[in-house]
Amino acid sequence: MNLFFSAPPLVAELEVGHHLYWHLGKFTVHGQVLIASWIAIALILTVVLLGTRQLQREPAGLQNFIEYTLEFVQSIARAQIGEKNFRPWVPYVGTLFLFIFVSNWMGNLFPWKLIPLPEGELASPTNDINTTAGLALLTSVMYFVAGISKRGLSYFKKYIEPTPVLLPINVLEDFTKPLSLSFRLFGNILAEELVIAVLVLLVPLLIPVPVMILFLFTGAIQALIFSTLSAAYIGEALEGHGGGDHHD
């Protein structure tokens, strides 16, 4: 009988559901997500400040890396929004890409266990649905801001075209597109961290390394997908449902 009812495996030591909550007046916020997000933002700001404190006409080192990253983000915005309209949206698209990219990589590389908490454990900000849904809702807001800034209140006419019967569907579509991004990002990053945690418990020396390298690649791809599609939605709002010339 002991063969069938032996002690549970080490994987049972993985605990989920424990969170650090902060109570601010009547509001309860997820402390782990805020701390991890602040760490990601601090890393980004540190690299940017170090790379731009002594700008040179011929960039080298960290400045060269920052300029390459800026050109890469500009290419995303230009391709999805269009040559005429992309420049005002580069900061937003760049912020999305950098925050998601750094957050995803932190989930695989950052030694979270070295930062003790009263409850729970730190993890990548993007493995929490609150973060990804917040980013998606922010993209929805930018979508409406782009449309209204371009066409004024006449922007809302598109919701009753070609017939007012489609009003609920058109409204729902504009909210479900960015929300689908949030669930994709959340699911991928959460699954990656759980797989790595299980492998580290089972085979702590060899197997997790190539898996972590693979997840670093997929984390970068997820950041690219989220920022690219967010830029595409903004370009759609600027040019209308017909697509316009946002691929100039």
Curated annotation (Swiss-Prot):
It holds the Pfam family ATP-synt_A. It is found in: Cellular thylakoid membrane. Disulfide bonds: none annotated. Key component of the proton channel; it plays a direct role in the translocation of protons across the membrane. One of its GO terms (molecular function) is proton-transporting ATP synthase activity, rotational mechanism. PANTHER family: ATP SYNTHASE SUBUNIT A, CHLOROPLASTIC (PTHR42823:SF3). The keyword rRNA-binding does not apply. Its main location: membrane. It comes from the Bacteria. The keyword Transmembrane applies. F-type ATPases have 2 components, CF(1) - the catalytic core - and CF(0) - the membrane proton channel. CF(1) has five subunits: alpha(3), beta(3), gamma(1), delta(1), epsilon(1). CF(0) has four main subunits: a, b, b' and c. One of its GO terms (cellular component) is plasma membrane-derived thylakoid membrane. InterPro entries: ATP_syn_F0_a_bact/chloroplast, ATP_synth_F0_asu, ATP_synth_F0_asu_AS, F0_ATP_A_sf. This is ATP synthase subunit a. It is a multi-pass membrane protein. The chain crosses the membrane at residues 31-51, 90-110, 129-149, 195-215, 216-236. Gene3D superfamilies: ATP synthase, F0 complex, subunit A (1.20.120.220).
